[in-house]
């Protein structure tokens, strides 16, 4: 496990700013009160607010054509979790992580769940991605996944989503987000109604697999 920021350091650095913070908070509270707004009620809601960190958010991302990794970028989901834990230490509002599959797939999800528990992190929505082909993929998503005219490609996309559901159950996630890259570029390339019907049929199979 990589070295995280010492929580004592965070506390010490925050303490240096506490006096100014309290002064600004009081001034803002007085201003809001003139408009019949209770700053304490807003603060209470803000303290309860939580944001899920997308696993890809800990990396440098990419361009339309390629990825250019930066120094210190996490190499796998375990390192992404470590970075996510640091974000939560600093913000105190990001206790959940939202993984993207197939990129975050692991061999042992029990191990991954234990790793996240040790970091005091839980899992938000599972993101299923079928908008690009993976190395060695038998059937292509070039012309769509869940709405592809090829039954074999549709079945492959459906199977991936069903796998995502099982992985989510193992991690304790309660939701599935399906990222669909299906579509066409020019008028006349695709029969919209037929494509939509194929998509709905695929989604019904996926929906039936939800717990």
Sequence positions of predicted segments:
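Active-site acidic/histidine proton-transfer and metal-coordination neighborhood
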Residues: 3-4, 20, 30-45, 122, ...
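Alpha/beta catalytic barrel-like cores
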Residues: 1-149
């Amino acid at each position: 496990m990589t070295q995280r920021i010492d929580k004592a350091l965070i506390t010490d650095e925050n303490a240096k700013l506490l006096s100014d913070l309290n002064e600004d908070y009081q001034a803002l509270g007085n201003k809001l009160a003139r408009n019949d707004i209770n700053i304490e009620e807003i603060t209470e809601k803000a303290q309860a607010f939580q944001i899920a960190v997308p696993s890809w958010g800990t990396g440098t991302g990419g361009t339309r054509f390629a990825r250019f990794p930066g120094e210190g970028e996490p190499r796998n989901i375990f390192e992404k979790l470590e970075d996510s834990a640091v974000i939560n230490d600093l913000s105190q509002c990001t206790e959940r992580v939202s993984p993207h599959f197939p990129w975050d797939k692991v061999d042992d999800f029990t191990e991954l769940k234990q790793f996240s528990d040790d970091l005091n992190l839980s899992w938000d929505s599972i993101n299923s991605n079928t908008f690009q082909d993976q190395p060695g993929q038998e059937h292509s998503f070039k012309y769509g996944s869940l709405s592809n005219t090829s039954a074999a490609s549709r079945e492959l996309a459906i199977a991936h989503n069903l796998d995502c559901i099982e992985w989510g159950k193992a991690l304790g996630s309660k939701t599935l987000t399906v990222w669909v890259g299906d579509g066409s570029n020019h008028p006349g390339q695709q029969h919209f109604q037929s494509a939509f019907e194929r998509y709905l049929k695929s989604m019904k199979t996926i929906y039936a697999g939800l717990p």
